[in-house]
A protein has these predicted regions:
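A conserved mid-protein helix/loop that constitutes part of the nucleotide-sugar donor-binding site
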Residues: 61, 65, 70-84, 105
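Aromatic "clamp/platform" in nucleotide-sugar-dependent glycosyltransferases that forms part
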Residues: 143
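Short hydrophobic beta-strand element within catalytic cores of glycosyltransferases
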Residues: 160-163
């Protein structure tokens, strides 16, 4: 809170990553800000080679979560919902702990009776690229987000995404992803089951995702908007 007040009082300009945060500064402090979101460019799609060797993962045979293992990401909803989905697909939880391993251990305890659920730990480089490139669905079931870069990245790889209906996710995907009610395990499970049974619908979202997100949140445009602000 002290940092916010200092920024409001002293900063020449304030850049925010989401329209929700922009509204917050306006309502709480009466301060105008500049909304400049995260950006992405189209990546190189990689075949499932390293992830196959390390985890036995093949293209379109797994649902992916990739991010920090913290409560606000909604991973417990995803695990609970997935455990009741009738599918041979795996659930891959990729990412490391934030401060301690306590929450990660809770997640592993939740998942221990379902051998379809795989924890990869922190990933980067080729592993990360392959996980994004070959997922059947990418899910971000968060209760709270700023500007979810992982969602932009997932769509840039051409993923069908399943996200919670919080503004920070819904405003990014618009009608180009599957949306479920925040914190609602039943709705999440239902949407997962439907997606696992309807490959044609999933493919439709995949076909639209990359072009849409790379145009809407192009990183070159983001850089130019930031430079324009500094030139003033």
């Amino acid at each position: 809170m002290l940092g916010e007040k200092c920024a409001v009082k002293c900063a020449d300009e304030i850049i925010v990553l989401s329209e929700g945060v922009q509204s917050y500064f306006r309502e709480v402090y009466g301060r105008d800000t500049k909304f400049i979101p995260n950006g992405v460019n189209r990546p190189v799609i990689r075949k499932a080679e390293l992830i196959d060797k390390k985890f036995g993962l093949k293209k379109d045979e797994y649902i992916l979560f990739l991010g920090r293992l913290v409560p606000e990401k909604g991973i417990t909803y995803l695990i609970e919902g997935f455990k009741n989905v009738k599918t041979d697909k795996k659930l891959v939880i990729a990412g490391g702990s934030s401060d301690t391993d306590e929450f990660a251990n809770q997640l592993k305890e939740m998942a221990k009776d379902d051998d379809r659920i795989i924890f990869t730990g922190f990933v980067q480089g080729q592993l990360l690229d392959e996980l994004y490139s070959n997922a059947y669905i990418y899910s971000l079931p968060s209760d709270l987000e700023g500007m979810p870069l992982s969602l932009l990245e997932a769509m840039s790889y051409g993923n069908c995404c399943l996200v919670s209906d919080i503004d920070e996710c819904a405003s990014v995907v618009e009608d180009k992803a599957i949306i479920f009610k925040k914190s609602n395990v039943g709705d999440l499970q239902s949407k997962l089951q439907e997606a696992c049974e309807d490959a044609r619908r999933v493919q439709k979202y995949k076909d639209e995702a990359a072009d849409y997100i790379c145009e809407k949140y192009n990183s070159d445009d983001v850089v130019e908007r930031t430079l324009e602000l500094y030139r003033r």
